[in-house]
From Swiss-Prot:
Belongs to the paramyxoviruses fusion glycoprotein family. Residues 76-96, 158-209, 481-516 form a coiled coil. GO terms for cellular component: host cell Golgi membrane; host cell plasma membrane; membrane; viral envelope; virion membrane. Residues 1-25 form the signal peptide. InterPro entries: Fusion_F0_Paramyxovir. This is Fusion glycoprotein F0. Residues 26-524 are extracellular. Disulfide bonds join C37-C439, C69-C212, C313-C343, C322-C333, C358-C367, C382-C393, C416-C422. A lipid is attached at C550 (S-palmitoyl cysteine). Glycans are attached at N27, N70, N116, N120, N126, N500. The keyword Chaperone does not apply. Pfam families: Fusion_gly.
């Protein structure tokens, strides 16, 4: 009788979701900033998980005694096969309970050293599974340890003496009851399947009568359907080390999940949000194997509590921004590293750097605050003015101009450098745009794919309005000679400080070089002057010598009268 109602509800939900999606997607806007090679997608609303709601789910089991019916009837054989599967499932759950208890205990000891998490302690029991399987359990629990801490706390209490009987008694006359556990916490418990009464009071009496013959095949089918849920739950817990996520429809059917949401102590708006997005709720929920005891299988379902809803959210997309010099290897690059989801939260901003951890449904963003950082609202200034003095924007630098594309909500950012060919195409018209070197943006209007080299990107087809904000690429403001490379976790101020240090070093080097050159110049001048003086003196001496020599050559010889008389007399005397 429930199936037609579920179909009607499903159709209504789908129509409402389609209408909501079409209406809300019109509010999405996107702004591309050419100066920083980044884009901001706006118009989203928040659904931030701030806590957990835990509930205990039970399945009543039958302690099947030896079935004495071994007839040859085909339907009886099918029943016996299902009973064997049932017994094997119960045995597997019992072994799994031991292994997960021990794994939880070991995870509690290892978490402080590996992840600084603390899990609630559980009673140590013997583990009959292989070491490889135990290591798999431990690794899984280490990965989700902090997320399931509250669920493990409830699961631990169920292992105390009398807790299972307390739940079993509360569910004798109803399928849902609030039970106060020994630790003082009240939890909602639900019985989703009663295999005990069905097997003991309906199935086995039919099988064991009339010479072990079953005339109605519906009996076989009914048991297979009921047993299948237990078998699937066992399989999921076994494969996933006792902790499963998302919560499957075997753990909780849609009607059971909606009923549980309706009983949660939250506002009507929160209930409506969760009821309209049950698939997202399932993805962010956990099922935790607890105990099988007193003919009861009990497991904990941990659902998210969305304490922050309907606040504005936006997503930042970034891509490398490089210079476009033709000389290979001479370019410098800068990339904003603050990409991710942002949501307003109580006067500040919750930042989710791993955008893939958030789930988007239409214009609704479901994120877990455990994965967030709290930032001041001034972080928004980085989008319009990356050099603003109120918030130090985060960047990384390099000297490798790699071409790539980033798909945004309403288009694509294309970083095209070197000899890479970058194009945008329409499936009917072919290439409609070829990108030149640099960072550019294309909206999804009339564009189906973006190609960068040999890589093909498919753009989103979400409706909305795109805005291209032009501006001088900030990378052009930097000198390649002093630009710091390979800064992977830096900020604008840190990069500028390193540039200033480099410039100061260059200035100091120039001053030292100037002083050295000045000293060398003075010495050279003195040496040159001395040489010139020596040369002048030598030239002067040579000039004086030549002058005296020439003067001596040009002066006539004169003799006195006595000398002439003597000469003449001597001459005449001969």
């Amino acid at each position: 009788m429930e199936l037609p109602i579920l179909k009607a509800n499903a159709i209504t939900t789908i129509l409402a979701a389609v209408t909501f999606c079409f209406a809300s997607s019109q509010n999405i806007t996107e702004e591309f900033y050419q100066s920083t090679c980044s884009a901001v997608s706006k118009g989203y609303l928040s659904a931030l998980r701030t806590g957990w709601y835990t509930s205990v789910i039970t399945i009543e089991l039958s302690n099947i005694k030896e079935n004495k019916c071994n007839g040859t009837d085909a339907k009886v054989k099918l029943i016996n096969q299902e009973l064997d599967k049932y017994k094997n499932a119960v045995t597997e759950l019992q072994l799994l309970m031991q292994s997960t208890t021990a794994a939880n205990n070991r995870a509690r000891r290892e978490l402080p050293r590996f992840m600084n998490y603390t899990l609630n302690n559980t009673k140590k029991t013997n583990v009959t599974l292989s070491k490889k399987r135990k290591r798999r359990f431990l690794g899984f629990l280490l990965g989700v340890g902090s997320a399931i801490a509250s669920g493990i706390a409830v699961s631990k209490v169920l292992h105390l003496e009398g807790e299972v009987n307390k739940i079993k008694s509360a569910l004798l006359s109803t399928n849902k009851a609030v039970v106060s556990l020994s630790n003082g916490v009240s939890v909602l418990t639900s019985k989703v399947l009663d295999l005990k009464n069905y097997i003991d009071k309906q199935l086995l009496p039919i099988v064991n009568k009339q010479s072990c013959r079953i005339s109605n095949i519906e009996t076989v089918i009914e048991f297979q359907q009921k047993n299948n849920r237990l078998l699937e739950i066992t399989r999921e817990f076994s494969v996933n080390a006792g902790v499963t996520t998302p919560v499957s429809t075997y753990m909780l059917t849609n009607s059971e999940l909606l009923s549980l949401i309706n009983d949660m102590p939250i506002t009507n708006d929160q209930k409506k949000l969760m009821s309209n997005n049950v698939q997202i709720v399932r993805q962010q929920s956990y099922s935790i194997m607890s105990i099988i005891k007193e003919e009861v299988l009990a497991y904990v379902v941990q659902l998210p509590l969305y304490g922050v809803i309907d606040t504005p959210c936006w997503k930042l997309h970034t891509s490398p921004l490089c210079t476009t010099n033709t000389k290979e290897g001479s370019n410098i690059c800068l990339t904003r590293t603050d990409r991710g989801w942002y949501c307003d939260n109580a006067g500040s901003v919750s930042f989710f750097p791993q955008a893939e951890t958030c789930k988007v449904q239409s214009n609704r963003v479901f994120c877990d605050t455990m994965n967030s950082l709290t930032l001041p609202s001034e972080v928004n200034l980085c989008n319009v003015d990356i050099f603003n003095p109120k918030y130090d924007c985060k960047i990384m630098t390099s000297k490798t101009d790699v071409s790539s594309s980033v798909i945004t909500s309403l288009g694509a950012i294309v970083s095209c450098y070197g000899k890479t060919k970058c194009t945008a195409s329409n499936k009917n018209r072919g290439i409609i745009k070829t990108f030149s070197n640099g960072c550019d943006y294309v909206s999804n209007k009339g564009v189906d794919t973006v190609s960068v080299g040999n890589t093909l990107y498919y753009v989103n087809k979400q409706e909305g309005k795109s805005l291209y904000v032009k501006g001088e690429p900030i990378i052009n403001f930097y000198d390649p000679l002093v630009f710091p490379s390979d800064e992977f976790d830096a900020s604008i101020s840190q990069v500028n400080e390193k540039i200033n240090q480099s410039l100061a070093f260059i200035r100091k080097s120039d001053e030292l070089l100037h002083h050295v050159n000045a000293g060398k110049s003075t010495t050279n001048i003195m040496i040159t002057t001395i040489i010139i003086v020596i040369i002048v003196i030598l030239l002067s001496l040579i000039a004086v010598g030549l002058l005296l020599y020439c003067k001596a050559r040009s002066t006539p010889v004169t003799l006195s009268k006595d000398q002439l008389s003597g000469i003449n007399n001597i001459a005449f005397s001969n």
